[in-house]
Amino acid sequence: MRKIGFFGLLSALLLTLTTSCTSSESKISELTIYSGRTEEYIAPYFAIWQRESGVKLNIRYGDSAELAAQILEEGKNSPADLFISQDAGSLGAVAEQGLLTPLPKDVAEGVPAKYIQGNREWVGLTARVRVFAYAPDRVKVLPTSFTDLSKPIYKDQVAIAPTNASFQAFLTAVISNKGLPFAEDWLRKVKANGAKIYPKNSAIVEAIDKGEVSIGLVNHYYVWEVAEALGRPINVKNGYFKANDLGNLINVSGVGILASSGKKAKAEDFINFLTSERIQSRFVSDIHEYSLLENISIPEDLPPLSDLGAPNIDLEVLKNTKKTQDLLIKVGLL
């Protein structure tokens, strides 16, 4: 009797523990997200998730590079369950230190492999193309390469945003592809050619519209964004360099799950939500970024990604931002 009673009690205890673990996973009521995407653009999708899933999202917004540095400092003690970044470089820096967990193959199934980190530690959400924005009535000779912007024809007319993560990602690609001496020489020439410095991409587009400058390096959606904010057409268009030019870099926003998270299953559900056709279509219509899903339409009035002549750059190299930042400091642009 005692023997039967012991095993009966043990079985009941194991069943209780198993049920408790399953129940605790299914009843997760909160996820903590570090978001390098600004609240203005990403919060509406967070609201949809919270309403439909019943799971509250605790969001910490900030610059992607700064949030990556915060995660590196916190290490395995980070309270974050997910890290959303506006660029691949910041995700790569965190993944390199083993702080992101590989995603199962049934997560983000529709995203092409080239937009997923090799070990599946992060996945792309949207594509963002580097372009030159310009005033069509003032720029009569369009540049064919980013290197042209140091030429006398563009003296005192070029704008850049050295503190911006997207500019730094582009410069990181230049360093990786052309070497540090080449990148330094180009930066010094652009600076000597009278390049104007702005804090962010939208400020560059606004400056072109106001006539302060005539051409600037930005991401593709800022012309649309500024026109939307002003509620009127602006005197700015997107331009593209020749095929395979590094100035046509395609970067991605993306997301990864912290290895230290105890809520991985629910975090995976959230990634599947962000990479679903419904939300990907909203990214296109709401914020004018390219979906990474092949069956989703492209943003209005923009060419397909396949027509842009983007350079063949492994997004993994974009994590090497320290050399880039050191170079910008060296030439006096940071």
What are these language model-derived features?
Residues 131-138, 250-263, 282:
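A bilobed periplasmic-binding-protein/Venus flytrap-type ligand-binding module shared by bacterial periplasmic
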Residues 36-43, 62-66, 78-213, 246-249:
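Extracytoplasmic ligand-binding site segments that recognize negatively charged/polar headgroups
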Residues 35-57:
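Short, polar/charged alpha-helical segment
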Residues 22-24:
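Bacterial signal peptide processing site
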Residues 89-93, 214-235:
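A ligand-binding cleft/hinge motif common to bilobed small-molecule-binding domains
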Residues 17-20:
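C-terminal motif of bacterial Sec signal peptides marking the signal peptidase cleavage site
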Residues 289-334:
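An extracytoplasmic/periplasmic, membrane-proximal ligand-sensing/linker region
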Residues 156-161, 273-297:
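Periplasmic-binding protein-like
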